[in-house]
């Protein structure tokens, strides 16, 4: 399930800052904000029937011209943070190693991910989530 940016990032930061080893298992769906929170874990497991979805989030802006302009700048920043998180996770993905070599440059990965997200919501299977680097492995049992 998705969620609000600020709430999700509070959870993301708490996981990243934890001194404990954190494993997250995605069940059913990891979409929007939950796909970002998922990236905070030290170990990211996804069940076989879970789907993964990422996209540029939606926003509403209203009010005075300058306020809307400032909000747009903040939204751009949010998108950059999101892309940095995904890039950091995916740079080690098998897909990007096959496409760009064993040590793909993060800028190439980020460019690819940006292009995919600009085409709309990006839905992928559990297998593809592992292939791209959004998840570490499929959890068949534990």
What is each stretch, according to the model?
Residues 2-11, 15-61:
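Glycine-rich beta-to-alpha active-site loop
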Residues 61-142:
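Charged, glycine-interspersed solvent-exposed loop segments at helix/strand-loop junctions
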